[in-house]
């Protein structure tokens, strides 16, 4: 039995890597229905190596493919334009799944929910997934060509 009826998770999900997959797996482990906030192209313009971020439609396609391959059911993907997204509009959300790195974002979401009279979400935190180099696996490092989506160091181009 799932702990929560409705949980939320959000991100850019650019070049789906082990960290993204762990986050999504945890959300489906604890939630019956998972609301996934997927950042718009507009929202990612300030990220490192923004020019290399895949377009929204491609990220959406890759995300759906991952969900289907893993046979995850009961999800809604919603485009978001800011860190709060739809979390103040869906009253019945119960929990938010974040990484250690994005925990502060969950606090911002809860503050916004409280400001509009909604119950704060229970925060579920997963550990950061490390690369073989010892640093966290991140889309920024993948876009920079330093690691692959599995955390393996990229071989220098000769």
Curated annotation (Swiss-Prot):
Q: Which domain of life is it from?
A: Archaea
Give the protein family: Belongs to the eukaryotic CoaD family.
Keyword ATP-binding assigned to the entry: answer is yes
Cellular localization per UniProt: Cytoplasm
Q: In which pathway does it act?
A: Cofactor biosynthesis; coenzyme A biosynthesis
Reactions mediated catalytically: (R)-4'-phosphopantetheine + ATP + H(+) = 3'-dephospho-CoA + diphosphate
Q: Name one GO biological process term.
A: coenzyme A biosynthetic process
Lineage of the source organism?
Archaea, Methanobacteriati, Methanobacteriota, Thermococci, Thermococcales
Q: Which organism is it from?
A: Pyrococcus horikoshii (strain ATCC 700860 / DSM 12428 / JCM 9974 / NBRC 100139 / OT-3)
Identify this protein by name. Phosphopantetheine adenylyltransferase
E.C. number: 2.7.7.3
GO molecular function (one): ATP binding
> Which N-terminal residues, if any, form the signal peptide?
none
Gene Ontology annotations for the cellular component aspect, listed alphabetically? cytoplasm
Key words, A-Z: ATP-binding, Coenzyme A biosynthesis, Cytoplasm, Nucleotide-binding, Nucleotidyltransferase, Transferase
User: What is this protein's function?
Assistant: Reversibly transfers an adenylyl group from ATP to 4'-phosphopantetheine, yielding dephospho-CoA (dPCoA) and pyrophosphate.
Record flagged with keyword Nucleotidyltransferase: yes
């Amino acid at each position: 039995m799932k702990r929560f009826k409705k949980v939320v998770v959000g991100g850019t999900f650019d070049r789906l890597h082990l960290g993204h997959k762990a986050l999504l797996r945890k959300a489906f482990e604890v939630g019956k229905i998972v609301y996934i906030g997927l950042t718009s192209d507009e929202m990612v313009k300030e990220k490192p190596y923004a020019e290399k971020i895949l377009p929204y439609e491609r990220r959406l396609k890759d995300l759906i493919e991952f969900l289907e391959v893993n046979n995850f059911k009961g999800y809604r993907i919603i485009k978001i334009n800011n860190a709060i997204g739809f979390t103040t509009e869906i009253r019945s959300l119960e929990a938010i799944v974040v990484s250690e790195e994005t925990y502060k974002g969950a606090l911002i979401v809860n503050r916004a929910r409280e400001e509009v009279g909604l119950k704060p979400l229970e925060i579920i935190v997963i550990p950061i997934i490390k690369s073989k180099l010892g640093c966290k696996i991140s889309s920024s490092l993948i876009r920079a060509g330093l690691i692959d989506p599995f955390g393996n160091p990229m071989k220098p181009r000769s």
